[in-house]
C-alpha cells in the first residue's frame, strides 16, 4: 500500500514509513487509511482512499479531528487542504521550495467541523489551500475570515508530481552533460 502511494502520488517512501510508524497511515482492506486525530493526538476516525483516488471517512461527523502533520517548532501557521494526499503534497512542495518556512501544521479535512477552530484563530497565518469555487473552501473562509485563500488550477498533488518530474529531468540533463565532459578528458 505504501509503495502504491509512493508510485501513484509520488510521495516519498520515507514520509509514508514515518506516518505508518506513528499509526497515522495503515492498510485496511487493501486501501490506504489515514488517521484523523485531535490536536492532542487522539485518533477519532479515518480517511479511506479508494482505488479511484477518492476519500471517504469512517465517522464523518467527528468534530475537531483531522488528518494532520506538523513541522517541528511552535506552530505559527496552518495550511488547510481537502484531504491527506493534498496536505502531504503541500508540505512537500513547501519543503522543496523553502528551507525557512515557519513551523506549520498541515491539515486534511472533509468538512469544517473537523477544524480546530479556536487553535486556528490564534495563529499568525492560516492558508486555505482548497479550490476556491468549492463549497468546503467557502465554508472554511466563513469560519476563518482572516484566512488567506491559495487555490491552484490543478491539485496540489499534481503540482508536486510536476515539481518532482522537473527535478528529475534537470538531474538527467546534468548527468548527460557530466558524461559528455568526462568523454572529452584525455588521460594521456
Label each region the model flagged.
Residues 39, 86, 133-135:
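Short, glycine-/Ser/Thr-/acidic-enriched flexible segments
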Residues 53-73, 78-81, 85-110, 117:
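Catalytic phosphate/metal-binding cores of nucleic-acid and nucleotide-processing enzymes, i.e., regions
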Residues 5, 92-188:
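TOPRIM fold recognition
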Residues 1-62, 70:
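Basic, glycine-enriched DNA-binding surface that flanks or lies within the catalytic cores of DNA
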Residues 25-27, 81, 119:
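Sterically constrained small-residue positions within well-ordered secondary structures
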